[in-house]
Regions:
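Conserved P-loop NTPase motor core of helicases/translocases
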Residues: 190-191, 195-199, 243, 251, ...
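Charged, low-complexity interaction regions that mediate assembly/partner binding
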Residues: 7, 13-97
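Pre-Walker A (Motif I) flank of P-loop NTPase domains
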Residues: 220-226, 250
């Protein structure tokens, strides 16, 4: 079994790679599709079973649910998403599994113990020990939540991650005569990776094995794999390889299976003075970790106050248009159009500035499919803890 990664120009993966005896890369990936479908169906049924049979108290203890919770203020975040603060009022000492990007659902428990789920799905934007910020589908959801006095929140089955992985497998299976097909065949063992000859770089602060690994990474044209037992310094080697690669390339993408691993790499790179842009929110929340997240950087941009004001005007104008007469609506349409054009212009400007100033873009594997990264290309992709991920991720 080998790990397949979404295509970039070349890959540096840090994983334990096992033998694969499949007949061809395509048949291997088709088999992975079957395995992923089995896992998808199992998790879906397990979620259904937990939802229908597992009591709230047990789900709370497992970190899958908060109950009771208190809805706080609702507002539009820097990405112009409608969000609401959710705070748990009991069992604050229990660790939970809520984190950025995970879907959630809300429920109400009546006096007789019956649970009724609300008819919408939300997404976690931020989570710490006592508070979750949730992206809502619309203003109606805010009204529904704030009117409920016996509210709970729990993790929902993650269709989005599975959909992303199925699409990645399908893209790789259909690839023909392009860079994706080359990397697919290399990663699955039917084509040898290429390496360039470079004069070895000395790293006196690394041991000889780590130094050799970094130099091997620098010489690769396609794929390099660094593997070894736990505690042998693979992540240290990864950080050094990234740092050295940035002497040769303007920007790289760094991914890991878990948010915790992405946080760890990002923090180490920031300590080395590398400008990092973190897609998604960290699991450990402090000013240092938040300072390089996309949302915090977006809000700190000099053009953001103007953008915030324009977005507010758009919402207010839209509200007046819905309430006004036909002639009034016609008069406001041109204003709305100008406001939207200016908002789009500012969003593009801020987004361009943030990505142009970053040397490392960091995210989980699934979050690398985030809309913010659509259409972007990176000369090199680094993946930490690759053996912990599903092939499709």
């Amino acid at each position: 079994m080998k790990y397949f990664f979404y295509p970039k120009r070349r890959f540096v993966t840090f994983a334990l790679i096992m033998n694969n005896n499949s007949k061809s890369p395509v048949s291997d990936l088709q088999y992975q599709q079957l395995l992923l479908r089995m896992e998808y169906e199992y998790e879906k049924e397990e979620f259904k079973r937990q939802t229908e049979t597992m009591g709230i108290a047990r789900k709370v203890k497992r970190g899958l649910c908060w109950y009771p919770v208190s809805p706080g203020r609702s507002y539009y975040n820097s990405l112009n998403q409608l969000v609401i603060d959710i705070t748990r009022t009991e069992n604050k000492e229990i660790e939970h599994s809520f984190e950025f990007g995970r879907p959630v659902c809300f429920f109400h428990q009546s006096f007789d113990g019956k649970v009724k789920y609300m008819n919408f799905i939300a997404t976690v934007s931020y989570a710490d020990e006592e508070r979750i910020v949730v992206v809502l589908p619309g203003a109606g959801a805010v009204i529904e939540l704030q009117a409920d006095s016996s509210l709970g929140i729990q993790l929902y089955f993650d269709e989005t991650s599975y959909r992303t992985m199925f699409e990645a497998l399908e893209d790789a299976i259909r690839a023909k005569g392009n860079r994706l097909s080359e990397l697919r065949d290399i990663l699955l063992g039917t084509q040898n990776p290429g390496f360039r000859e470079l004069y070895p770089v000395r790293f006196p602060w690394l041991n000889s094995t780590q130094e050799t690994a970094v130099n091997k990474v620098l010489c690769t044209r396609d794929v390099a794999i660094v593997h070894g037992p736990p505690g042998t310094g693979k992540t240290t080697t990864l950080v050094e390889a990234i740092y050295e690669t940035l002497h040769r390339e303007p920007q790289v993408l760094v991914c890991a299976q878990s948010n915790t691993a992405v946080d760890w790499i990002s923090e180490k790179l920031v300590d080395r003075g590398v400008p990092v842009l973190r897609i998604g929110n960290p699991t450990r929340v402090n000013d240092k970790m938040l300072s390089f997240t996309y949302e915090r950087r977006f809000e700190s941009h000099p053009a953001y106050p103007e953008l915030w004001g324009i977005r507010k005007s758009i919402r207010e104008t839209g509200s007046r248009m819905r309430k006004g007469s036909y002639s009034e609506r016609e008069g406001m349409r041109s204003r709305m159009s100008r406001l939207r054009d200016r908002a789009t212009e500012l969003e593009i400007q801020i987004n361009t500035d943030l990505f142009d100033s970053a040397r490392v873009i960091a995210s989980t594997l699934v979050s690398s499919n985030h809309r913010l990264l659509n259409g972007r290309r990176f000369p090199t992709l680094f993946i930490d803890e690759a053996a912990q991920a599903l092939e499709a991720a």
